[in-house]
Swiss-Prot record:
GO terms for biological process: determination of dorsal/ventral asymmetry; flower development; regulation of secondary shoot formation. Transcription regulator involved in the dorsovental asymmetry of flowers. Promotes dorsal identity. This is Transcription factor DICHOTOMA. Residues 201-218 form the R domain. Residues 87-145 form the TCP domain. PROSITE patterns: R, TCP. Keywords: Developmental protein, DNA-binding, Nucleus, Transcription, Transcription regulation.
């Protein structure tokens, strides 16, 4: 009645759709192909008029389901890549001025052994508790560290103010040796801000005083030279007066004013006896006048030399 060949004819599936094939599509979705085979066979048995399915149509339908509407294998790769979500970092980071810091810390072998020994002695179950205990015990050391940092920052800021005040000072008075030493001290780090400023002011005041003394000495020497070169110094009376005044300057402040007055009176009397008129002196006494002038010039030169020595000593 029934033809055995009709029931024993199974649809032949091409080797490309075999679940053991080497193609990428079949190897990824082998279970779907087996179910598809089961549907095809069951439909063949149940249908009164079974349809002969061609392998090309079966493969195209499967490829359309897997690859999308376009049948592009790149779409399959994109869909698989979208499904793999990247792993998120479960450990939150701590934002610090130098950048974000990870809460996880990697310890060296020696420190890790010491740390876990301490944790076992304390009986804590978490490392964070051990670190909290260590931080609480070292509060005083942390305070000292903060104070030392603040003091160092204040000291580093103070020399800049001192340097500005030193640079704003009068530069012409820094030429002396003591002025250079004072500036050298002020250029270093100021341990006490106000003390360094006071020292700089004192050094500048001393330099000004020394400069004033030098100018006074130079003016005195200049005046003496001008008086020596004047034409009226040929007068004998002026010569004797200048001689007595220079003897007073050379002898110093220890000479007595009364003795000098007596000498000047005696000189005037001699001049009246020997020279009755101011300009009517006789040619016989001309040699004496030249002697007086030579003595005056020699004494003035001695005075200049003494003043120069006094200047270099100071």
């Amino acid at each position: 009645m029934f033809n055995k060949k009709r029931y024993l004819q199974y649809p032949q599936v091409p080797p490309s759709l075999n679940p053991r094939a080497s193609t990428s599509v079949v190897s990824l979705n082998g279970n779907e192909i087996l179910l598809h085979h089961h549907d095809v066979i069951s439909g063949y048995y149940l249908a009164s008029n079974p349809q002969n399915l061609e392998p090309d149509a079966l493969f195209n339908g499967f490829h359309h389901d897997v690859g999308g509407t376009n049948g592009d294998p790149l779409v399959l790769a994109n869909t698989l890549a979208k499904k793999h979500t990247p792993k998120k970092d479960r450990h939150s980071k701590i934002n610090r001025p130098q950048g974000p810091r990870d809460r996880r810390v990697r310890l060296s072998i020696g420190i890790a052994r010491k740390f876990f020994d301490l944790q076992e002695m304390l009986g804590f179950d978490k490392p964070s508790k051990t670190l909290d205990w260590l931080l609480t015990k070292s509060k005083e050391a942390i305070k000292e560290l903060v104070q030392s940092k603040s003091s160092k920052s204040n000291i580093s800021n103070s020399p800049s103010e001192c340097d500005q005040e030193v640079l704003s000072a009068d530069l012409p008075y820094i030429g002396s040796s003591k002025g250079k030493a004072a500036v050298g001290l002020n250029s270093n780090k100021c341990k006490g801000g106000r003390d360094a400023v006071d020292l700089a002011k004192e050094s500048r005041a001393k330099a000004r005083a020394r400069a004033r003394e030098r100018t006074k000495e130079k003016m005195c020497i200049k005046q003496l030279n001008q008086e020596r070169n004047k034409s009226y110094e040929w007068n004998p009376s002026v010569l004797f007066q200048s001689k007595s005044s220079q003897q007073f300057e050379v002898s110093g402040p220890s000479t007595n004013y009364e003795e000098l007055n007596q000498e000047s009176i005696m000189i005037k009397r001699k001049l009246k006896q020997n020279h009755p008129s101011m300009f009517g002196f006789q040619p016989e006494n001309a040699t004496e006048n030249w002697d007086y002038y030579s003595n005056f010039t020699s004494q003035s030169n001695q005075l200049c030399a003494i003043l120069d020595q006094h200047k270099f000593i100071n």
